[in-house]
């Protein structure tokens, strides 16, 4: 039995996009940037897969050095890149199914702190310690890619 028609799914998807856009704008306007960033980062942490963190942790525990860990993790996660001494997660498109259909300019780039939390959860879970993640580029704010620098 079909639970929803295609048009109902499209309508629900558009409604969710409007809801998220309104939520982010409301958070930013009413609780401020710092709190909004913390909330979104926590949401991203919850979106991270426990099995992927475990896989990354296993790679780290078997690696003889940070470089070996990053090289091996990069083989299983193609978005991980090293540029000199810097480590990045780079996405050529927005993979967040909650917002990637929202037209450019309708959603604040502050939303991408959700992805920042996802990246932090991955590396903190693997390394067993805090890391800092800096959002350098964001498709939502008009950049051609999303780029997160991981400070290990």
Per-region residue spans from a language model:
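N-terminal accessory segment detector
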Residues: 1-111, 132-135, 139, 152
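Active-site helix/loop of acyl-thioester processing domains in fatty-acid/polyketide metabolism
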Residues: 110-128
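Coil-to-beta-strand transition motifs
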Residues: 130, 141-145
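C-terminal edge-of-domain segments
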Residues: 145-152
């Amino acid at each position: 039995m079909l639970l929803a028609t295609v048009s109902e799914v499209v309508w629900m998807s558009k409604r969710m996009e409007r809801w998220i856009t309104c939520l982010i704008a409301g958070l930013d306007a009413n609780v401020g940037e710092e709190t909004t960033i913390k909330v979104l980062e926590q949401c991203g942490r919850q979106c991270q897969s426990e099995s992927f963190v475990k896989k990354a942790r296993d790679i780290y525990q078997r690696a003889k050095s940070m470089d070996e860990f990053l090289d091996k993790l990069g083989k299983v996660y193609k978005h991980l890149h090293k540029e000199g001494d810097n480590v990045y997660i780079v996405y050529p498109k927005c993979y967040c199914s909650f917002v990637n259909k929202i037209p450019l300019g309708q959603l604040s780039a502050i939303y991408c702190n959700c992805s920042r939390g996802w990246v932090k959860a991955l590396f903190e879970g693997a390394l067993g310690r805090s890391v800092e993640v800096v959002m350098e580029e964001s498709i939502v704010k008009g950049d051609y890619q999303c780029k997160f620098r991981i400070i290990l």
